Amino acid sequence: MNKRIITIILALSAVCSGAVAQPKVSGRVPTREKRGYDQQIVIDTASVRVLYALNAKDIKDENTYIDLGKLEVGKRVKKYSSEFIDLSDEEAVKWKKKTGHTGYVPKSFWIGGRPELHENWSELVFSDYFIRGNQLKEYACFPLWAERENSSYTEPWPLMQWTLADEQQTILGHRCQKATCRFRGRDFVAWFAADVPIKGGPWKFGGLPGCILKVYDVQKIYVWEAVAIERGTYQIMQYPDKLYPKSTRKSVWQRQKKYTEDYLNAIGWTSLEGRPTPPKIHFEPLEKE
């Protein structure tokens, strides 16, 4: 058997069997070209952005994050996406210009986050969320060998109905108030700063009278915490629509769940040695329904 094929098979098996300990990541990192990393267009300019650590083991160390997310606030659009992915793509573009390379870019340009997860795909990391008025649009990128599933959909925003509480805490020097809600099968706790006039937060969170600086489900499977509020001039970029055909939230959600729980079977992988694929992993989706 070709040694390269054996290596790929073993690597894929290791990824899926090791994903049990970290149910929020699975599959393999998709190719940049299929994401359209070098075809993005500028749709707005942000003057402020908020950076969030996702599931940090040490909030002071980016190398312990699953992701460093960012909320960019423009005049017409708000966007939540991965800063780690954007930084990695910027380095890849620089390298292509410097070397004149015209083929696929090596995956070694990944910047930030837990080193053991650099080869893994996560539906949260590899999705961009755009908010225009009262509408949210997700551009969902799927893992390696499933990029044909890349899709987009829209839904109303915000959909969360919050209950305010009296508790307060300080985050990044801002006095934050507690709020709670139940959303698509999970109970969430958010801490928002009324003195930061941004009605939004990480992922799809919003609907509070101030910027959400910390939010988590009550089981703390998913935890976002703001690590910086930055002011400057930031271009808000968008992938080309042609690479992300229109779909529905339910369809995207079902497919993201499928590729996370059972990646090898989902991509139609078959062992050349006749070995069975690893069992499904236990996955706790952010949206349960």
Predicted regions and their residues:
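Bacterial Sec-dependent N-terminal signal peptides
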Residues: 1-33
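Extended soluble regions of mature proteins
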Residues: 23-289
